[in-house]
UniProtKB/Swiss-Prot annotation:
Cofactor mode of binding and number, as noted: Binds 2 manganese ions.
Pathway entry: Carbohydrate degradation; 2-deoxy-D-ribose 1-phosphate degradation; D-glyceraldehyde 3-phosphate and acetaldehyde from 2-deoxy-alpha-D-ribose 1-phosphate: step 1/2
Lineage start: Bacteria, Pseudomonadati, Pseudomonadota, Alphaproteobacteria, Hyphomicrobiales
SUPFAM superfamilies for the chain: Alkaline phosphatase-like, DeoB insert domain-like
Reaction catalysed by this enzyme: 2-deoxy-alpha-D-ribose 1-phosphate = 2-deoxy-D-ribose 5-phosphate; alpha-D-ribose 1-phosphate = D-ribose 5-phosphate
Family: Belongs to the phosphopentomutase family.
The protein's required cofactors: Mn(2+)
Pfam families (alphabetical): Metalloenzyme
One GO cellular component term: cytosol
Annotated residues for binding of Mn(2+) 1: 10, 346-347
Species of the source: Rhizobium johnstonii (strain DSM 114642 / LMG 32736 / 3841) (Rhizobium leguminosarum bv. viciae)
Predominant place of localization: cytoplasm
Molecular functions per Gene Ontology: magnesium ion binding; manganese ion binding; phosphopentomutase activity
Protein name per UniProt: Phosphopentomutase
Amino acid sequence: MARAFLFVLDSFGVGGAPDAAAYGDEGADTLGHIAEFCAAGAADRAGLREGPLSLPNMSELGLMQIARSASGRFPAGMPVPEKVYGIYGAATEISRGKDTPSGHWEIAGTPVSFDWGYFPIEGDAFPQEFIEALCREADVPGILGNCHASGTEIIARLGEEHIRTGKPICYTSSDSVFQVAAHEVHFGLDRLLAFCGLARGLLDSYNIGRVIARPFIGQSASTFQRTGNRRDFSVLPPEPTLLDRLIEQGRHVHAVGKIGDIFAHQGISRVIKANGNEALMDASLSAIDAAEDGDLVFTNFVDFDMIYGHRRDVPGYAAALEAFDARLPDVHKKLKPGDLVVLTADHGCDPTWRGTDHTRERVPVIAYGPGIRSRSIGVRRGYADIGESIARHLGIPAGPHGRSFL
């Protein structure tokens, strides 16, 4: 029997989405623009990184060919290897949102065919009746924010007032999301999670995809920083996913990082929490050791998106990609005959783009393992082909969406 390891490099888009203009994202290309900045010396940072973007392991697995097929060009300054060792291609999202749940659910074989609810950009973001009900049920004196904002910016701006007043900081973005920032000590982590749980229930009727708890510490705007205790409160996927189908067949799904939250803890056998890409890779390697025949290890590497993409930090994103690439040999060493590794992404978040939100892009699809024959799979229509390929590899019945490339 076989095993599968699915790694989502959160927001690592490769450009070229045919519908990008409808989202205001025409020309967005996370990989391509990072490579351009690196090649031009604009992503050098003392003590962190310098020079052209260097991803030798992913390049040997077909990343350069993926970039060209998705966006029409090779990334600047990056050598194209003579030989490729993996299955490689790109995928075009068919779900309407460019958000985390839509991308992950579609990867797991369940595209999102409906429109999420969103909050208005102008004026107060949240309905007054919702805020009144939430404050009443949570017994808080009110909220701060009530707007679209960058998380780090709004914590710096309102964090001190939050500590003085006890009012949680509530904000949103272009995603279908209600985010709540609160101090872990002054407000309390348990109280923050309870507040978000109440919000989740009240927002179901508004069709909001996620409520996110964003705890932070520090005593002033200059010292505030988020902690690793983030939690996402998601709605359930609209139909059974690959994860549910595996559980039904008696398999185990090892959810590393925020995967459990993204799937509302449905179709999950084991949750392994870790904070930061390095710790997430360590946890993934441990999960690979624990995985039995027929199991899936599913990891989200969130730093690319949360720390570097949204904050438009090109050197940081480049360094994180290089660090991830350098860890891939650790994965290779763990592989047994019958194992399959898949590397992909859920959307883009071009750190050179205007604003702070996700960008509509195609995503890379890399698959490799012992005995896997290298070949191009072209540009796939829909991420669900990834989930269906894993289903076929693990020997479970096909689902209603997608087509295996194996």
